[in-house]
């Protein structure tokens, strides 16, 4: 009994996702269409990056890199800004979920190395917002952008120009938050970094490059995943054992929930009518309940106003924990590193995210 309770506490979000999937499965009984719910590429990329990040942790890569960042910058405020900006840039290049999987461990090691763990929740929240909003600028910055870019055949120049104003506002807001909420306290290393295993680190960085190449479709995702898995079986089986499999299952259950929601006639009819009133506003609201990727797929069937829809499903990625499934990655990482503090984190997460959501929604309403 105690073991079950402990498991539920540790994997609360996964259990909620499972319940949501099971409940909606009574409304939409399982059939062959369920197989189309899953974004197999996303799941493969998540597994690949999680596995490689675990391997890099095992050779102290992030710890040594964090030590170098601490030595480079004179105070914790600058370190925080750098971490958030790196996540911003990373989300534009390798997508929001991959950026978080890569740079959240770096954020942890920077703060831990500097002895500034009290800024952990704030830094993770800002990195999360940066990942969700930084990806809006490019078609491959997040899954919903890639889907809408392909469905509506949006010219790349038009796409970038449409998303540039809210992107610049997001950059400004996050930078201001870092300046206000993080004091310019001097920092120094608590421990002397160990020497890095160059050969193993080089091999794991090569595997990380393979994981990123999968995102850009240079090789089929299943080939990349198999190659990474087999390599780690030989080089570091502990990395495969350390993969956060409950996080992967959380995504699976949410895919089922969102897919079922999109097939319920009452919900489909509702969205069809409200989108005629205000596509931007209702796409933002939709994201808060069924996440931004399912919202983009569902709502694109009922509107041709791709500009408003594009804005809505991007800024709608902030707000609730399920507004963007990438936020579940951050929650899971924080809960693992800071057990027992999840409630406080969710409260801070909600306060910052809804503040950003209100400001960005009001701004985008002026653009459309």
Please provide the spans of the model-predicted regions.
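C-terminal transmembrane helix pair
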Residues: 160-171, 281-368
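Membrane-interfacial loop-to-helix junctions in multi-pass transporters
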Residues: 40-42, 71-84, 113-123, 198-203, ...
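Flexible interhelical linker loops that connect adjacent transmembrane helices
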Residues: 67, 180-205, 237-241
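Structural signal for alpha-helical transmembrane segments and their membrane-water exit/capping regions
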Residues: 2-33, 45-60, 181-183, 210-238, ...
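Hydrophobic transmembrane alpha-helices that form the pore/transport pathway of multi-pass ion
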Residues: 85, 89-133, 147, 297-311, ...
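Transmembrane helical segments that form the transport core of multi-pass membrane transport proteins
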Residues: 37, 59, 63-66, 207-304
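Interfacial loop-to-helix junctions that mark the boundaries of transmembrane helices
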Residues: 4-10, 32-42, 154-166, 193-198, ...
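Membrane-core helix-loop-helix motifs of multi-pass transport proteins
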Residues: 115-183, 188-190, 332-360
């Amino acid at each position: 009994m105690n073991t079950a309770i402990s498991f539920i506490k540790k994997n609360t979000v996964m259990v909620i996702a499972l319940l949501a999937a099971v409940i909606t499965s009574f409304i939409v009984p399982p059939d062959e269409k369920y197989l189309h719910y899953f974004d197999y590429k996303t799941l493969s990329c998540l597994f690949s990056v999680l596995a490689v990040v675990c391997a890099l942790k095992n050779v102290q890569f992030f710890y040594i890199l964090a030590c170098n960042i601490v030595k480079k910058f004179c105070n914790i405020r600058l370190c925080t800004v750098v971490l958030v900006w790196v996540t911003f840039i990373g989300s534009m290049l390798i997508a929001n979920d991959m950026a978080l999987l890569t740079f959240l461990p770096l954020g942890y090691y920077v703060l831990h190395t500097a002895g500034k763990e009290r800024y952990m929740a704030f830094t993770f929240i800002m990195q999360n917002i940066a990942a969700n909003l930084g990806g809006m600028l490019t078609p491959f910055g997040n899954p919903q952008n890639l889907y809408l870019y392909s469905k509506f055949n949006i010219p790349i120049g038009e796409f970038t120009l449409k998303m540039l104003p809210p992107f610049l506002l997001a950059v400004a807001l996050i930078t201001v938050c870092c300046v206000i909420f993080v004091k310019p306290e001097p920092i120094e290393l608590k421990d002397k970094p160990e020497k890095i295993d160059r050969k193993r680190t080089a091999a794991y960085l090569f595997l990380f490059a393979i994981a990123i190449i999968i995102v850009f479709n240079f090789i089929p995702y299943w080939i990349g995943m198999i190659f990474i898995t087999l390599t780690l079986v030989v080089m570091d089986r502990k990395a495969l054992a350390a993969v956060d499999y409950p996080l992967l299952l959380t995504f699976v259950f949410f895919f089922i929930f969102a897919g079922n929601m999109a097939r319920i006639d009452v919900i489909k009819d509702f969205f069809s009518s409200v989108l005629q009133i205000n596509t931007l506003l209702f796409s933002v609201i939709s994201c808060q309940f069924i996440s931004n990727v399912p919202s983009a797929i569902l709502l694109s069937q009922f509107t041709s106003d791709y500009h408003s829809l594009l804005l809505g499903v991007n800024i709608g990625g902030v707000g609730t924990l399920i507004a963007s499934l990438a936020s579940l990655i951050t929650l899971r990482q924080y809960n693992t590193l800071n057990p027992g503090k999840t409630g406080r984190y969710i409260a801070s997460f909600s306060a910052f995210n809804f503040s950003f959501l209100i400001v960005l929604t009001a701004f985008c309403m002026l653009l459309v």
